[in-house]
Amino acid sequence: MLHLFAGLDLHTGLLLLLALAFVLFYEAINGFHDTANAVATVIYTRAMRSQLAVVMAAVFNFLGVLLGGLSVAYAIVHMLPTDLLLNMGSSHGLAMVFSMLLAAIIWNLGTWYFGLPASSSHTLIGAIIGIGLTNALMTGTSVVDALNIPKVLSIFGSLIVSPIVGLVFAGGLIFLLRRYWSGTKKRARIHLTPAEREKKDGKKKPPFWTRIALILSAIGVAFSHGANDGQKGIGLVMLVLIGVAPAGFVVNMNATGYEITRTRDAINNVEAYFEQHPALLKQATGADQLVPAPEAGATQPAEFHCHPSNTINALNRLKGMLTTDVESYDKLSLDQRSQMRRIMLCVSDTIDKVVKMPGVSADDQRLLKKLKSDMLSTIEYAPVWIIMAVALALGIGTMIGWRRVATTIGEKIGKKGMTYAQGMSAQMTAAVSIGLASYTGMPVSTTHVLSSSVAGTMVVDGGGLQRKTVTSILMAWVFTLPAAVLLSGGLYWLSLQFL
């Protein structure tokens, strides 16, 4: 690992350490800000002692990051303006990363201090949008192009739909439990609050199987949170490393010969597909004429311009770099590796446009998505030590400051105390929906899903909601996005004044 940092001068080394500290601090805040959601219900239903619950959440957050894959990590990264992603080594790219992280840290710390379960995901996405808008305004480019609108809309869709799903499904579970699981005295215990059970049965803990279900569902929430939110931290660390130390991280320097061959085969197959469907490529790119591949033996200009009409030419360049004798990326110069990354990201954007075309069959869509995944496999990666560092930061953060937000979730959303059935329904809904989102690569808000699930159970159970708390949570939800947009955009503009 350390050899990848060899050759960095003092200034670059310090910049790298500072940037990594920023990302890991952001992830630690995410731990004590969002993971309160995983422990709130088990603590307030007395299924686990608070210290044990927090350690459990930290451990399963850690495992969630380690085992969760990278689909969400790069879904977030690709929301950034393409021109900044293609030029991550520039001072503008670094200013972007620092502004984005600082904005997210300021807002997350503020909402945590006041005990508001605001969304770290919303904050990060708002910060990314702020960067995109400021970059578009300063460079005079189209806001629509700068913001990667299709990606932004799909992520917004998941963030808006996920709390509604939480509300409806958790409420539905409570309805079913009330209808079919309250006929006998033994079954009806699941609908008691801890205080009611102590008064009625003289016992402080939930019934055995109810307690097991509460603990398992809390483990599910913690694991799902690590798999979804932890990946966002991994994506940010990779952005930093590509920007500050591109020589070691612009592509996966540890890629095996097999992985490089897989990338090369994908490039050949993408080119073959586009050569067979030139009309589709023209339609997707909006170009009257595609730039053809150069004649054999002709020299190509050194500078590559990313434009969809250049796709065939771009694929030809990639083939020229990744010849069959390249079994390790060490054989390519830094310039070649950087250009290879730029071209692959450019081709990837074109593939995304073609996949969305109405004339593309479902089989072709699957084929193109698979080829895109194979092509990007050696640039969309994360070393194990990065995954471990993010997992540790998230786990440590969980154990530090969980109490403020957990109190809001456990005590202040409903007018009455939380019953065992409500806690279990909210957690099961959150664990399943966040887990599915991580599997499909959609970033969702753990906070929104669990808060809305708790609210759904309270409404269906007839307990009602505390207006003051719900208003505060809704205000935090509404203002998180514009606040993050303004903060990151302002910080980015300010930082560029000094470059």
Swiss-Prot record:
Where is it chiefly localized? membrane
Stimuli inducing this protein: Expression is not constitutive, as initially thought, but regulated in response to levels of zinc and phosphate in the medium. Expression is repressed by the PhoQP-regulated MgrR sRNA.
Tell me the compartments it is located in: Cell inner membrane
Q: What ranges does the Periplasmic topological domain annotation cover?
A: 1-4, 73-93, 145-154, 228-232, 403-429, 494-499
Q: Which cysteines are joined by disulfide bonds?
A: none
The answer to whether keyword Lipoprotein applies is no
Say yes or no: keyword Ion transport present.
Answer: yes
Q: Where are the transmembrane segments?
A: 5-25, 52-72, 94-114, 124-144, 155-175, 207-227, 233-253, 382-402, 430-450, 473-493
Source domain of life is: Bacteria
Cellular component GO terms held in the UniProt record: plasma membrane
InterPro entries (UniProt xref): Phos_trans_PitA_PitB, Phos_transporter
Q: Which is one GO molecular function term here? A: tellurite transmembrane transporter activity
What is the reported phenotype of gene knockout? Answer: Disruption of the gene confers increased resistance to Zn(2+), associated with reduced accumulation of Zn(2+) when cells are exposed to concentrations of ZnSO(4) below the minimal inhibitory concentration (MIC). Mutant is approximately four-fold more tolerant to tellurite, and cell viability remains almost unchanged during prolonged exposure to the toxicant as compared with wild type.
Q: Which GO terms describe its biological process?
A: arsenate ion transmembrane transport; magnesium ion homeostasis; phosphate ion transmembrane transport; tellurite transport
Q: How is its activity regulated?
A: Phosphate uptake is dependent on the presence of divalent cations, which form soluble metal phosphate (MeHP04) complexes. In Mg(2+)-limiting conditions, the PhoQP-regulated small protein MgtS and sRNA MgrR both regulate the PitA transporter, leading to increased intracellular Mg(2+). Metal phosphate uptake is inhibited at low internal pH. Inhibited by the uncoupler carbonyl cyanide m-chlorophenylhydrazone (CCCP). Is also inhibited by the energy uncoupler 2,4-dinitrophenol and the sulfhydryl reagent N-ethylmaleimide.
Entry keywords, A to Z: Cell inner membrane, Cell membrane, Ion transport, Magnesium, Membrane, Phosphate transport, Symport, Transmembrane, Transmembrane helix, Transport, Zinc, Zinc transport
Catalytic activity, per the record? phosphate(in) + H(+)(in) = phosphate(out) + H(+)(out); arsenate(in) + H(+)(in) = arsenate(out) + H(+)(out)
Residue intervals annotated with topology Cytoplasmic: 26-51, 115-123, 176-206, 254-381, 451-472
**Membrane topology, record value:** Multi-pass membrane protein
State the similarity comment.
Answer: Belongs to the inorganic phosphate transporter (PiT) (TC 2.A.20) family. Pit subfamily.
The entry describes its oligomerization and partners as: Interacts with the small protein MgtS, and this interaction contributes to an increase in intracellular Mg(2+) content.
What is the purpose of this protein? Low-affinity inorganic phosphate transporter. Mediates proton-driven uptake of soluble neutral metal phosphate (MeHP04) complexes. It can use Mg(2+), Ca(2+), Co(2+) and Mn(2+). Activity impacts bacterial growth in low Mg(2+) conditions. Is also involved in Zn(2+) uptake, probably via formation of a ZnHPO4 complex. Can also transport arsenate. Involved in the uptake of tellurite.
Q: What is noted besides the main data?
A: The Pit system in E.coli K12 consists of two transporters, PitA and PitB, which can transport phosphate independently of each other. Both proteins may have contributed to the kinetic values and substrate specificities determined in earlier studies.
Return the protein name: Low-affinity inorganic phosphate transporter PitA
Q: Which organism is it from?
A: Escherichia coli (strain K12)
Starting at the broadest rank, the lineage of the source organism is: Bacteria, Pseudomonadati, Pseudomonadota, Gammaproteobacteria, Enterobacterales
